[in-house]
From Swiss-Prot:
NCBIfam families per the UniProt record, alphabetical: recR (TIGR00615)
CDD domains associated with the record: TOPRIM_recR
Keywords: DNA damage, DNA recombination, DNA repair, Metal-binding, Zinc, Zinc-finger
Designated name of the protein: Recombination protein RecR
GO biological process, one term: DNA recombination
Zinc fingers typed C4-type, residue spans: 57-72
HAMAP family per record: RecR
UniProt key word Zinc-finger: yes
Function: May play a role in DNA repair. It seems to be involved in an RecBC-independent recombinational process of DNA repair. It may act with RecF and RecO.
Length: 200
């Protein structure tokens, strides 16, 4: 089926969303045009406002429309803890755990094949933030448990070796409530390597 230029433009725009392929984009576009034009208009307005009004927090680099995000603006947070994550969605995930320290958001992970070195993801800014703040005693490396995430965490830990900080890595392994037979070998190996004694 061939679509008019405006419909094709809408479909192509919707395909830029993660996980949205050709068929899904077509369904979304036709749904908005045929059944929910007011919803489509609200979506367009919200998207336009977000694209022009949302930037990055000057301290942690997460997404916000203010100079400081809510976490950086909160004086009750623990200034001795700094959690390093790969992206803004990770901040929201860590917040669900009750973590009350500060954040630094990288722009992804090290990936030399994709041209993403330390400068591209903001590691020099991370080091500068640690040195300028001067209150951190522990840096928690909460990068994803992928090869690239592990390499990024290792690189940062090496950089911070002589800074007088505790550098820790979030644990990962068998999920709570998971069954061993369903866990992949790499995850299980990590779980065995990171095993801890049972405190009685």
């Amino acid at each position: 089926m061939s679509f008019s230029p405006l419909i094709r433009q809408l479909i192509d725009a919707l395909r830029t969303l993660p996980g949205v392929g050709q068929k899904t984009a077509q369904r979304m576009a036709l749904q908005l045009l045929e059944r929910d034009r007011s919803g489509g208009t609200r979506l367009a307005q919200a998207l336009s406002q977000a694209m022009t009004g949302v930037g990055h927090c000057r301290q942690c680099r997460t997404l916000t429309e203010e100079e400081l995000c809510p976490q950086c603006a909160d004086p009750r947070r623990d200034d001795t803890l700094l959690c390093v994550v790969e992206g803004p969605m990770d901040v929201y995930a860590v917040e669900q755990t009750g973590y009350r320290g500060r954040y630094f958001v990288l722009k992804g992970h090290l990936s030399p094949l994709d041209g993403l070195g330390p400068e591209a993801i903001g590691i020099p800014q991370l080091v500068a933030r640690i040195e300028e703040q001067g209150t951190f005693t522990e840096v928690i490396l909460a990068t994803n448990p992928t090869v690239e995430g592990e390499a990024t965490a290792h690189y940062i830990a090496q950089l911070l070796t002589n800074k007088g900080l505790i550098t820790s890595r979030i644990a990962h392994g068998v999920p709570l409530g998971g069954e061993l037979e369903l866990v992949d070998g790499g995850t299980l190996a990590h779980s065995f390597a990171g095993r801890k004694p049972i405190a009685l």
